Amino acid sequence: MRLRAGFEIARPAAVVWDELCADDALHWCRILNDVRWTSPRPFGVGTTREVKALAGANLLREYYFRWEEGHRHSFYVKETTSPLFKALAEDYLVEPRGEDACRFTWTIAVELTAIGKPGKPVNRALLKTLFTDTARHYGLTPA
């Protein structure tokens, strides 16, 4: 399952990038309860992060395999407590659109386990709330 959303944001790319890398990154996403970097700054390839989701029911340990400072980073989940996901990866791309605007493209790719496949529509809906919440955070109309 692959989901992608693009957001045209009326903020400089550097501001959006800093938010995505902040200590409280993604605090606006309802299904994420705690996002904690487990690597020291400055971040780069090899950075790790832990995320608690769904009221702490799911813990994800993420490993960043791509880091292009100020522009793009990508990670895969190296460990999760959820029996529903066989693999999960995300890519964040921030592209300037002039001095005071940017485009943020967020891609999520998930491979469900045999147990998770019957719940694909529910999993898709839950993951899409990340996009809806992000649109609201940036003052955009959710798609």
Regions found by a protein language model. Name each.
Residues 28-31, 54-101, 109, 140:
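Hydrophobic-ligand binding "helix-grip"
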Residues 16-20, 25, 49, 64, ...:
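Hydrophobic pocket/interface hotspot
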Residues 42-47:
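A short, glycine/Asx- and small/polar-enriched loop/turn
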Residues 103, 108-143:
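A conserved amphipathic terminal alpha-helix motif
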Residues 1-41:
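Hydrophobic ligand-binding cavity/cleft-lining segments
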Residues 3-9, 92, 106-108:
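A structural signal for short, well-ordered beta-strand segments
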Residues 9, 81, 110-114:
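Beta-strand elements of well-folded, non-transmembrane domains
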